[in-house]
């Protein structure tokens, strides 16, 4: 009698079924992980801008003269040091009023970020008194630490 070599069709089908079950669990978890990491990346992109805004306001530069871009700052205008598209996941916008209140906002781009984040925003809000808060329109499970649902 010959010794058996290889696997039977049933054994191979069982292995394929097990791999399919594992993939059905792992893929959604990975997509959630990606969405959470994108939120952290967006917040890390805009968080340093708080320092630039505060420094500009303390030098007496009015909020409307705090602009997005990497151009060299002048005596009466501050460029925040990053481009609007500094992070490939979306765009950055800075809107500070002359009174000192305003926002630094990151908007996730459709097609560049995960579908779970597309079109969502992370916003750093500044009050005229200089208090910063963070809000996000992302689903609760994807909001980075330190931010809240509006």
From Swiss-Prot:
Assembly behavior: The pili are polar flexible filaments of about 5.4 nanometers diameter and 2.5 micrometers average length; they consist of only a single polypeptide chain arranged in a helical configuration of five subunits per turn in the assembled pilus.
InterPro entries named among the record's database cross-references: N_methyl_site, Pilin, Pilin-like, T4P/T2SS_Core
Residues bearing PTM N-methylphenylalanine: 7
UniProt membrane topology term: Single-pass membrane protein
PANTHER family: GENERAL SECRETION PATHWAY PROTEIN G, PREPILIN PEPTIDASE-DEPENDENT PROTEIN D
SUPFAM superfamilies, A to Z: Pili subunits
Chain positions listed as propeptide in the UniProt record: 1-6
Transmembrane segments: 7-27
Superkingdom of origin: Bacteria
Disulfide cross-links: 134-147
PROSITE patterns in the cross-refs: PROKAR_NTER_METHYL
Listed GO biological process terms: cell adhesion; type IV pilus-dependent motility
Record's GO cellular component terms: membrane; type IV pilus
Species annotation: Pseudomonas aeruginosa
Keyword Membrane: yes
Keyword vocabulary terms for this entry: Disulfide bond, Fimbrium, Membrane, Methylation, Transmembrane, Transmembrane helix
GN (gene name): pilA
Subcellular location: Fimbrium; Membrane
Pfam family, one: Pilin
Entry protein name: Fimbrial protein
Principal subcellular localization: other
Stated family: Belongs to the N-Me-Phe pilin family.
């Amino acid at each position: 009698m010959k010794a058996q070599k290889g696997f039977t069709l049933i054994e191979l089908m069982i292995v394929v079924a097990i791999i399919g079950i594992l993939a059905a669990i792992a893929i959604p978890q990975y997509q959630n992980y990606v969405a959470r990491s994108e939120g952290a990346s967006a917040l890390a992109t805009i968080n340093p801008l708080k320092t630039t805004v505060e420094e500009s306001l303390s030098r007496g530069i009015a909020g409307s003269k705090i602009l997005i871009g990497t151009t060299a700052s002048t005596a009466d205008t501050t460029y925040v040091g990053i481009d609007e598209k500094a992070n490939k996941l979306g765009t950055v916008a800075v809107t500070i009023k002359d009174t000192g209140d305003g926002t630094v906002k990151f908007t996730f781009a459709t097609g560049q970020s995960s579908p779970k984040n597309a079109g969502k925003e992370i916003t750093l809000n500044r009050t005229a008194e200089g208090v910063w808060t963070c809000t996000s329109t992302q689903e609760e499970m994807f909001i980075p630490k330190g931010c809240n649902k509006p």
